[in-house]
Amino acid sequence: CSYCMSPNSKIDRKALVMRNNPIIYSVDSLSSLSVGNGGFAYTVDFTGLQTFPDKYKKGIPLGTQSQWGWHSFANDKNFRFEETLKEYDFGRGRKELYSVQFDEPGRQHEAANWFRINPHRLHLGIVGLELPEAKPEDVKNIRQMLNMWQGIITGNFNINNVSYEVKTTCHPNRDEIAIQIKAKGMKPAVNFRFPYPTGEHSDDACNWNADDKHATTVVRTTENSAVLKRELDSTVYFVQLQWENEAELKEKSTHYFVLQSAADQLNFTCCFSPTYPEDENSTTEQSIAAAADYWHRFWENGAAVDFSQCTDPRAKELERRVVLSQYLTAIQCSASTPPQETGLTYNSWYGKFHLEMIWWHQAHFALWNRPQMPEKTLPWYHKVEPVARAIAQRQGFDGVRWMKMTDPSGREAPSSVGSFLVWQQPHLIYLAELIYRANSQTDEQKKILNAYYPLVEETAEFMYSFASYDKEKDRYVLKGLIPAQETLKASETVNPPFELSYWHFAMETAQKWRERKGEKRVAEWDTLIHKLSPLAYNEEGLYLAAESAPQTYEDIRFTSDHMAVLGALGILPSNRLINETYMRNTLHWVWDNWNWDKTWGWDYPMTAMNATRLGEPEKAVSALLMDKRTNTYLTNGHNYQDERLRIYLPGNGGLLTAIALMCAGWDGCTTPNPGFPKDGRWDVKWENFSQMP
């Protein structure tokens, strides 16, 4: 799969990006646009600011979020994490302690809830036009564009006979927005409003009815700047405002400040920081230039794929999704902590992140030859390693057990589902391997090997100790877990197919890392690799949701949610556990019969990767563009799921990973563009992908 284009047909990357810039012409609560830098994002309405947050609350909320902005409500009842633990016996000769939710009212129920809700991610503040009398319906002549090539949103609109022109960008290296406003016949004003958190599962994190629970004070002012200090219980952060025209900042009411310009133009920057800001903000022009430079380099480096020569009518939409997904994951999924499923736009699961999703959020970066993006995040695993080791020890396992739903501290969020998942475990090994492969320089590879070898080793130690030896059948089994297909129960599940295949791949990869380090392979690990149970199937030659689910095809519970069996060959390379004929049979059955209404955004790229590895490119393309609700991609490129999850970044990341596989293939694949039909309609041009394993 070394297929690539000749040098004289280089992709025009600027044209590729620019033709897919989203343009907004109307008030639509699902068409918010964002600027960001990977660890901070600012989401705006059609005004280029957060002028009408209520209108967007149930759409894509107008968030200002960061990797560092977290808050906990006071723990008045002194809940201890130990109060969330419950004993389970999964037949491993001991009791194991898991952090779970409790249905029955009482202290344990309250403790579990407290640890689920806290800490939660903060909305750092609304920055909007001050238009007290205006309503969204009053707006005319909207034309707003996100220029992804420069990382800037430009827009024009008319409200109450005043024409506005607004530019919005985010500094690439500071959590700072830069805004330029021109108003014909009006002196523009901007408001800065600060909410208290809600502690709700999925929302904009803005409680406007708790003014007495937090404080916003002006701690420094100059002629053209001010620093605001925010205090919410034990959380403190700062907001530094700097303006470039004659203007005055006034406190309108508690937590509500207005910057009023003296002329028809207002240029200002607003920097959010967890510590007192020692330096001045950049100027708006400096920020615009820094963002443009960053985004030019982003688009000029790494992989690119151009569908403009394809004659299949679906190609244009596929290209749009691919370009927008690169932008969205770059601004929201590349920080020093893992991303939440709704990124830095609005809270889902209280703003916490899910480690079983990190592969979907970040694997594509390495395959698109942007390994520096996940390299920002992986050091976090070092930081929380002691917490993960304590989980493994508490349950009687070796090594480290990576948590499922967590926060920057690595503390588990109690969950009666999440605490029993294990497919987050091998992700660390897979991501480290992809980063290693994406760096071709020996020195770089050595650095990566030294940095992540201890984590790879400890991750594999847990995986080995988690597998149970079945003496009677002389094999290793996986049990006492909830698989990626979460409709199965921990107490019943034995040998789910995706986890078996992942154990095989990750343990073999861990051995490879030992060899690269000059260490011997671990003999016991090799025994596990050779004696892992093959995937269970029925008499029709269809793979089961688990060996313990012989009734897979008679019970809708087993044919809903993620069709994780397809991930066993797709996300992962082929191995001795898999019979490709049975896998093909399973793909065809899933295609025709699955409960597609109960799927998630990454199920479509997972299906596409499975079809690609099975040599069914028409199915691969059709999977990516299947007309289902959870495969909807909005004007701004966000992957809409349902009323709760209006955006879903694992879907965007999965799409990019699937495209990498469909273009560049995998180790040993010799078919050019293996994921695209050879019918003359898919003349796909690409550059600089890495192959998948």
Predicted regions and their residues:
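Active-site core of glycosidic bond-cleaving carbohydrate-active enzymes
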Residues: 50, 54-55, 354-390, 408-411, ...
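Catalytic cores of secreted or luminal carbohydrate-active enzymes
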Residues: 109-138, 650-691
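Primarily short, surface-exposed interaction patches in extracytoplasmic proteins
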Residues: 306-315, 319, 337-351, 437-447, ...
